[in-house]
Amino acid sequence: MKLQLIAVGTRMPDWVTRGFEEYQRRFPRDMALELIEIPAGKRGKNADIVRILQKEGEQMLAAIPKGNHIVSLDLPGKNWTTPELATALTKWQLDGRDVSLLIGGPEGLAPACKEAANQSWCLSALTLPHPLVRVVVAESLYRAWSVNTNHPYHRE
C-alpha cells in the first residue's frame, strides 16, 4: 500500500523537509510514504481566496490516482487517538487501495477536496501551520504502523 501525502506548498523550510524525510525513510517498502507538493496560489491584499482555493483543490484532486481512498485533514474531521489511527491504517490496508491524504494551505482545503474525501481526519483542535502538519502526519502514520507491527517505536 502507498500512503500519498498531497500538500499545498513548495519550498518548505529545511527543518520541515528533514522532519518529513526522517519518517518517510522509516516506512517499509510495502507501505511507502510519498509526498506530492501542489504550488500555493499567490496571496496578497487583493487576492481572490475563493479562486485560489478552487485552483489548489483542482490540482490536488488531479494528483490523486483513480481508485485511491481519500482522507482530508480538516477541523471538522474525526479526532483519532494513536490506537484509532492504527485501526484506520489496518482498515486501509485490508481495503487494498492506496491512500491519499490531503493537506490544505493557509486557508485550508478547497470545498471540492472535502467533498471528494472518503474520510476526514482532524489532526488537532489547535491551529497548526500547514508545513508542520506534514511532519506531524508523517510521524503519526509511522507511529500507527509501529503499533500494528509491534515495533518498539511506540510505547504505552
From Swiss-Prot:
Superkingdom of this protein's organism: Bacteria
The keyword Mitochondrion appears for this protein: no
InterPro entries registered for this protein in UniProt: Alpha/beta_knot_MTases, RlmH-like, tRNA_m1G_MTases_N
Coiled coil: none
E.C. numbers: 2.1.1.177
Cellular localisation: Cytoplasm
GO MF term (any one): rRNA (pseudouridine-N3-)-methyltransferase activity
Keywords: Cytoplasm, Methyltransferase, rRNA processing, S-adenosyl-L-methionine, Transferase
Catalytic activity from the UniProt record: pseudouridine(1915) in 23S rRNA + S-adenosyl-L-methionine = N(3)-methylpseudouridine(1915) in 23S rRNA + S-adenosyl-L-homocysteine + H(+)
Residues engaged in binding S-adenosyl-L-methionine: L73, G104, L123, S124, A125, L126, T127, L128
Top-level enzyme category: transferase
GO CC annotations on file: cytoplasm
Keyword Chaperone found: no
Quaternary structure (record): Homodimer.
Function statement: Specifically methylates the pseudouridine at position 1915 (m3Psi1915) in 23S rRNA.
UniProt family annotation: Belongs to the RNA methyltransferase RlmH family.
Name of the protein in its database record: Ribosomal RNA large subunit methyltransferase H
Species name: Shewanella baltica (strain OS155 / ATCC BAA-1091)
Classification lineage: Bacteria, Pseudomonadati, Pseudomonadota, Gammaproteobacteria, Alteromonadales
Gene name linked to the record: rlmH
